[in-house]
Structures are given as structure tokens and as C-alpha cells.
Amino acid sequence: MPIPFSKKSRRNIVRQKPEDGASPKRSTRVRLRPRPDWHKRNFLTSVLIPSLFVRRSGDRFQPQFPKIQKGEICLTWIGHASFLLQTHEINILIDPNWSKWLKVIKRLKRPGFEIHHLPEIDFVLVTHAHFDHLDRRTLRRVAANQPIVVPIGVGNLVHDLGFHIVHELDYWQTVQLGPLTVSLTPCYHWGARFLADLHRGFGGFAVTVDGRTIFHCGDSAFFPGFREIGDHYKIDIALLPIGAYEPPTGREVHMNPEEAVKAFTELRAKVFVPMHYGTFRLGYEPLDEPLQRLQAAARSHGIEEKVLVMTEGKPVVL
């Protein structure tokens, strides 16, 4: 039963109910207490201020979206954790972000193409409420009364942006959107957008269409749940974060590249697409370090042929 908002908003949130009436089991939120030595480095002077003087890089392409056959998946990386996922009949945006700033953090690499080059979007998925994943300015521009799927507790942040129905999911819950099956998967992270809203959910998405499954991890530190996710789904393409593993707070809230390789092997996926690197300087590590470390780790584990390094704005048919 949709949960009505005020008449002013004229939007509904649909919360999926577990079949047995019990609340789905949630993974443990990461500890928010920083490491004891976190204060020994100064993120403001060593990262934020120097970034202000760095020119944005990256080419913006006039995207040439190919004609997609039934059973094919076309994936376009926009940058950071943002992807356009296309099949022969639908277009899906995941964690779209075209903004030049995350509050005081400068975007250092441009999106792969301008937002007005997007095809008509049928569905939008947002993994959690952090500013780099839930960008209200971008969502407001792409909203055209299509459904949006978010974790439980995030619906009130997006319901007034122009989406017809907001689907809130808890872990392992699923919603059917036309030919698309979307499930929220566990992760090891946290979901607060501000300091006092720790109730907000967070997770990844397993998206199944035409018999193929794409897994977008969202944000996560490494945790045993990746093996469980691999048990639940036969994953063809895994979009895994590899950056921001040296955050200014010292909290271990993101995987490093070596852990991402381990997560990929436990997921037992076929293709590894790295993301969440090279766009915003969210950690102390150099902007180009995550990809270098990933490629080295992939070689050492013999999976380099399974790693697909994408260029922002260039569609790839899989």
C-alpha cells in the first residue's frame, strides 16, 4: 500500500513488505569511530585546498549510443559511481551525478557527456543518501515522473524531485519494474546524509533483465556478505568501487583495490568494472593510484582479462 505524502508533494513511497512479515536481516553498519591516528593528517591543507587549483580533466563526448539487440547490455560510465544501463527496450540511471562540486569537494574529472545528451530514462536507482551518490540537483534534472528505487529511509529525500513513485527496499527485497527485476543487496557502509539521520538505509543493487544480472555495489568496505550475494545471484557484470580507501576520518568505509579483487572473486562474477575513483578526491590517496593498484592486483590474481576499465562517456555493449 503506497504511503501518501502531503497533497503539496503528490508523491507516494512504496515500501516492500517481507512475505513472512518479518523484518529482513540487515548487515552491520560500519563503526563510525575513526582510527586513533586520524587527526595526524590534515585533509583541508593536503587535499581540499590543493584541489582548488587543479584544472578539471576529461573529454566530454557526443555519445553514440548503439542499437542494442535483445539479450545485450549497453553500459556507459558517466564518472564516479554513475552509470547509464541500457537494454533493447529500457534505459536505467544508477547513482547519477553531473555536479561540479560535492559541497566543498571539487569534481576533478568531467562527466563523460553532458546531461542533455541522455536518452529518455525509464528508471532511476540510488544506492544511498551520501552526496556523491544522491545528487538532488542531478535527480531533479533527470526526473520525468518515472519510478525511482532507493533503500529504506531514503524516500523522503527524493520524493519531491519529480518522480512518480518511490520504491523503498530493505535487504534482499525485490521490485519488478516492467522487464527489470531490482533487488537491494547488503553492504558494509553507512547511510546518513547528515549527522542525525543514521536511520537511512544503504546497499547495492542486483539488476536482472533479459536473463542477465548486473551488480552495482554502491559503497562498501570489504565484508563476508559478498560471498552471500554471489550465492543469491548469477552475476554477469560487477560494478565495484576501488577508491576513497584513505578517507579523512580514518574510518574503513570503502574497499581498497586489492579488497575489491577479493570481493569480485567471492561474487563469482564474469566481468569486473571498476568505479568510484578518478572523479572526486574523497581520500588521501592520489587520484590515479586506485586504478594502478587494481591492475597490479588483477595481474597477481590472474583475472586481468576480466577487468573492464571504462572511459567516461563511451558506451560498451556486453
Place the predicted regions along the sequence by residue.
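Zn-dependent metallo-beta-lactamase
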Residues: 1-93, 98-100, 292, 314
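Cap/insert and terminal regions of metallo-dependent hydrolase folds
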Residues: 6, 17, 23-27, 123, ...
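Pre-active-site segment of Zn-dependent metallo-hydrolases
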Residues: 21, 54, 58-70, 78, ...
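Active-site-proximal beta-strand elements of phosphoester/diester hydrolases
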Residues: 74-77, 91-95, 181-187, 213-219
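Active-site metal-binding loops of divalent metal-dependent hydrolases
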Residues: 96-98, 128-129, 187-188, 218-220, ...
